[in-house]
Amino acid sequence: SVACASGMAALTMALMNILRSGDHVVAAAGLYGGTVELLDELKAYGITTTYVRENTPQAFEAEITPQTKVVFAETIGNPKLDVTDIQGVAEIAHKHGIPFLVDNTVATPYLVNPLKLGADIVIHSSSKYINGSSDAISGILISGGSFKWNAEKFPGMAEFKKFGPFAYLAKLRNGLFRSMGACLAPQNAFLNTLGLETL
């Protein structure tokens, strides 16, 4: 796991640790507005996104292309409150050799553990329900360590495969996370630990 300065920092790190120019994301319909803005910003870096019309495994599969490198959804959509079939979408993503990234902010780990349902990477905007007190901004990124990174499809992961289940986090910690200032401030980490009792 990696603690980040915000939920958006966690999502940015999660995506940019995988993506490069020419890559494609298949994303759920009805995502949080800040997420849609981020995915729109990535167009300037040659990264495109296709949004599914409905959050069904079949709808996700219909949008996958050879350039797709991430399938992304929220456990419970914000603001539509639509629920993603995490297990079904994970099976589709893995069938195509693609990691499944899930934003579990609304459900929190108290209600849903997406890793147990097949997700590969999970992020939380812990500023919201994990903190519970509205006194700190923070985000969490968790890698389940089970995704098999194909060095041909994900060339950026090649030198980190030696770390086995920690390959994704090793790449993140030795690259973007260290150089882009996304780390969580100590005071916010402290406030989150106090707020956890309200979860």
PLM region spans:
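Conserved PLP-enzyme active-site core in the AAT-like
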Residues: 2-199
